[in-house]
Amino acid sequence: MEFLDDRERWLALPRVPRRIISLVPSITETLFALGAGRRVVGVTTYCTHPIDSVAAITKVGGTKDPDLEAIEKLEPDLIIVNDEENRHEDFSALEERGLPLYVTAPRTVREGIRMVAQLGPLVG
């Protein structure tokens, strides 16, 4: 399966992701709304909703200071980030570790709707 992210870079996944990390609070909520919440294994300290669900998920630092070693230890098969919320140097560091990264960058309501539509197939 191949997916084009908002950087216009292709991400190849061998199967539907089973171990997802979200480094964006709104994306964490979206993943739960899409029914993929049981496969989320890591979130930021700012990911607080859905309250009952994220409380037990491993925290991997903040949006601007993620713990790259903690992320790697979780063995994710998908990490979802945002072009404005997260730092580009962290994108590079995650990719250098060979971790699968999908970058979102919605800037309008229409693009936000498109992002949700793209996340559905991405997370199965």
Where are these regions (language model features)?
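N-terminal ligand-binding lobe of clamshell/alpha-beta domains
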Residues: M1-G124
